[in-house]
């Protein structure tokens, strides 16, 4: 009885292995070319926006601390690209709270973000 069970188990296992190993593999995409992936648009655009955001950190700090309503076009563009085209939670992972991220996104997406819309009141320490 144990011999029949063992034989059946080995036979089924062998048939499964042969079935899986003989299937046709899908063609591999050209994902090994790192230059093509980096210049493909999306990833590079996210890195550029992150670099631009790094250069406008002072503007963002003043925006929240002093209630200044001036964020440059490049800074707003970086916030917009990061929150819409890249990983939306990236600003949160950089240390901004979810509320601050939403305020930045709302300010930069408003039609009059050129300097006439009010910002948050200054933080009192």
From Swiss-Prot:
Compartments reported by the entry: Cytoplasmic vesicle; Secreted
Disulfide bond: is it a keyword of this entry?
no
Q: What does this protein do?
A: Involved in the regulation of gamete interactions during the double fertilization and to prevent multiple-pollen tube attraction; mediates the redistribution of the gamete fusogen HAP2/GCS1 to the cell surface after secretion upon sperm arrival.
Family label: Belongs to the plant egg cell-secreted peptide family.
Name the record gives this protein: Egg cell-secreted protein 1.3
Q: Which GO terms describe its biological process?
A: double fertilization forming a zygote and endosperm; regulation of double fertilization forming a zygote and endosperm; regulation of protein localization to cell surface
Tissue specificity here reads: Restricted to female reproductive tissues, specifically accumulating in storage vesicles of the unfertilized egg cell.
The record, for PANTHER family, names: EGG CELL-SECRETED PROTEIN 1.2-RELATED, EGG CELL-SECRETED PROTEIN 1.5
Q: Which UniProt keywords apply?
A: Cytoplasmic vesicle, Fertilization, Secreted, Signal
Asked if the Swiss-Prot or TrEMBL record annotates the protein with the keyword Secreted, the reply is: yes
Which Pfam families does the protein's record reference? Prolamin_like (PF05617)
Species in which this protein is naturally found: Arabidopsis thaliana
Q: Tell me where the signal peptide lies.
A: 1-24
- A single GO cellular-component term on record: extracellular region
């Amino acid at each position: 009885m144990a011999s029949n069970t063992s034989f059946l188990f080995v036979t089924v296992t062998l048939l499964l292995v042969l079935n899986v190993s003989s299937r046709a593999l899908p063609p591999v995409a050209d994902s090994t070319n790192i230059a093509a992936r980096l210049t493909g648009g999306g990833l590079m655009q996210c890195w550029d926006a992150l670099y631009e955001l790094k250069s406008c950190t002072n503007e963002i700090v003043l925006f929240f601390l002093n209630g200044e309503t001036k964020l440059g076009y490049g800074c707003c563009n970086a916030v917009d690209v990061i929150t819409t085209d890249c990983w939306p939670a990236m600003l949160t992972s950089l240390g901004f709270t979810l509320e601050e991220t939403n305020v930045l996104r709302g300010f930069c997406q408003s039609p009059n973000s050129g300097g006439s819309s009010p910002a948050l009141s200054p933080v009192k320490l």
